[in-house]
């Protein structure tokens, strides 16, 4: 395995800082929404509206970077992310939360587009998936401690102080971004992306599946699921542990898996082949989600979810690396597919809660959707004579 490029390390760290407010929003709000004067369906809207916005702004970001190249796009996006985290802590109405989530959706389109293409610009083609694993992994490792400490701070210092503090901390992303940025032209990849722009059907399908289940239904309702199992708090080794702390711990372990597993899983995907890896991972993920819905105790549920997170990490790393290799337009298309799934996912998950259906229904539904992804992947594997835009290298 090769070492991560220095520019990738700096940029991933900056991304992790400005992403922390959004990550904590998913951890804290599902367990605290009644204190904010929100109802479950409003929570679903807030957890998904930033993704709906990105359906329009992903291609806008790609166009802006390509047509009017300037570092001001990225600086503005980082600054907006810091301001939004502060607004979370100060907002008192659903409307203010909604405006903040919309602003974050716009900013993240520019951050993600720049991040993926930054990795492509800094990586050799035969090590792209591995370097993408480093990018997502470093980002995740920096956020791991932040998520756990954020949940802990919320339980001890309150909602407002936690998010205002995160907003101030996020400003460190500005100097880190300046260190990381490096100009790199990729005319061959952009030309290839234009040539293959009409052959991304399976890529779009996989993006929707990943976004709908992992980033949408599971993550947005994890705090609620854990709360129904343990209540507001529980005792562990003589200590009183709040549900926000438990949720933050689970989310932190998820990012730890991303951090440790990203480069390793990326290297394995390169060795095994993209089609075979994708088919196997979607099938395994479907089985694990089914098992999660059948778990009766919290410990078993957490363990199986961790295994599912490993599958999701491998899929996320491989698919983003391949879309990046195809060029900026493919990145925007794949990102939009993921965002569409992530937009619908929280509405489905919290809609299930609103209808008072068993919360295990969330995992059973996710299992069925992953099974669809597996079918598409196996069909692609059997049609090797009709290669996708992201064939194995």
Which residues make up each language-model segment?
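Intracellular juxtamembrane helix-capping segments at the cytosolic ends
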Residues: 110-123, 313-327
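C-terminal transmembrane helical hairpin of 12-TM major facilitator-type secondary transporters
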Residues: 275-318
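C-terminal membrane-cytosol helix-exit motif in multi-pass small-molecule transporters
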Residues: 167-186, 376-381
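Short amphipathic helix-loop junctions that connect adjacent transmembrane helices
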Residues: 28-41, 220-244
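Central cavity-lining transmembrane alpha-helices of secondary-active solute carriers
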Residues: 45-62, 249-264
């Amino acid at each position: 395995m090769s070492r991560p490029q220095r520019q990738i390390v700096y940029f991933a760290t900056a991304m992790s800082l400005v992403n922390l407010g959004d990550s904590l929003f998913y951890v804290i709000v599902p367990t605290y929404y009644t204190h904010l004067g929100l109802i479950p369906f409003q929570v679903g809207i807030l957890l998904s509206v930033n993704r709906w916005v990105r359906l329009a702004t992903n291609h806008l970001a790609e166009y802006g970077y390509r047509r009017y190249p300037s570092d001001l796009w990225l600086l503005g996006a980082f600054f907006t992310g810091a301001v939004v985290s502060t607004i979370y802590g100060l907002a008192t109405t659903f409307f203010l939360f909604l405006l903040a989530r919309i602003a974050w959706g716009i900013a993240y389109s520019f951050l993600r587009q720049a991040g993926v293409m930054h990795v492509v610009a800094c990586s050799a083609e035969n090590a792209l998936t591995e370097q993408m694993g480093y990018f997502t992994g470093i980002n995740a490792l920096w956020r791991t401690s932040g998520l756990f400490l954020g949940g802990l701070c919320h339980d001890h210092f309150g909602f407002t102080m936690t998010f205002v503090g995160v907003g101030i901390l996020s400003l460190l992303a500005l100097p880190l971004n300046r260190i990381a940025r490096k100009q790199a032209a990729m005319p061959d990849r952009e030309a290839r992306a234009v040539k293959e722009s009409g052959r991304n059907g399976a890529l779009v399908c996989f993006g929707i599946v990943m976004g709908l289940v992992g980033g949408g239904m599971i993550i947005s309702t994890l705090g609620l699921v854990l709360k129904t199992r343990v209540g507001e708090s529980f005792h562990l080794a003589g200590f009183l542990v709040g549900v926000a702390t438990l949720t933050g711990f689970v989310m932190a372990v998820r990012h730890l898996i991303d951090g440790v597993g990203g480069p390793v899983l990326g290297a394995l995907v390169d060795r095994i082949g993209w089609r075979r890896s994708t088919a196997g991972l979607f099938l395994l993920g479907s089985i694990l989600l089914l098992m999660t819905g059948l778990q009766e105790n919290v410990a078993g549920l957490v363990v199986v979810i961790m295994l599912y997170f490993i599958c999701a990490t491998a899929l996320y790393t491989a698919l983003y690396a391949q879309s990046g290799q195809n060029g900026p337009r493919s990145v925007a298309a794949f990102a939009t597919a993921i965002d569409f799934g992530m937009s619908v996912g929280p509405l489905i998950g919290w809609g299930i809660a609103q209808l008072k259906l068993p919360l295990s229904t969330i995992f059973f539904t996710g299992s069925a959707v992953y099974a669809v992804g597996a079918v598409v992947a196996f069909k692609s594997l059997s049609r090797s004579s009709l290669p996708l835009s992201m064939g194995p290298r």
